[in-house]
UniProtKB/Swiss-Prot annotation:
In the fully reduced protein, both Cys-69 and Cys-73 are nitrosylated in response to nitric oxide (NO). When two disulfide bonds are present in the protein, only Cys-73 is nitrosylated. Cys-73 can serve as donor for nitrosylation of target proteins. One of its GO terms (biological process) is cell redox homeostasis. Coiled coil: none annotated. The keyword Lyase does not apply. It comes from Mus musculus (Mouse). One of its GO terms (cellular component) is cytosol. This is Thioredoxin. The record marks 33-34 as: Contributes to redox potential value. The keyword Signal does not apply. The modification N6-acetyllysine is found at residues 3, 39, 94. The lineage of its organism: Eukaryota, Metazoa, Chordata, Craniata, Vertebrata. Disulfide bonds join 32-35. The gene is Txn.
Length: 105
């Protein structure tokens, strides 16, 4: 299941709770066409990769989280291990998203 992050505190708690697991964060917006396009694929990945934590951040609802993470465009996918960012890319690229998960997991 993809967890919707609604505050900076919830984001920090989710990263901490993940422990050694890979955390994939989808920074998106409701008005963003490419975000809508890749969202079903992103959600399907949580079934395929049960050992990975999937988070979703709406940049309009959580502007502080997006700013802290230096998100400049949507969609942006960031990858965290043990609370530290290990990777990032922007764009609705399904192949790159899945390849990044297998690389960092």
């Amino acid at each position: 299941m993809v967890k919707l992050i609604e505050s900076k505190e919830a984001f920090q708690e989710a990263l901490a709770a993940a422990g050694d697991k890979l955390v994939v964060v989808d920074f998106s917006a409701t008005w963003c066409g490419p975000c809508k396009m890749i969202k079903p694929f992103f959600h399907s990945l949580c079934d395929k990769y049960s050992n990975v934590v999937f988070l979703e951040v709406d940049v309009d609802d959580c502007q502080d989280v997006a700013a802290d993470c230096e998100v400049k465009c949507m969609p942006t996918f960031q990858f965290y291990k043990k609370g530290q960012k290990v990777g990032e890319f922007s764009g609705a690229n399904k192949e790159k998203l899945e390849a990044s998960i297998t690389e960092y997991a």
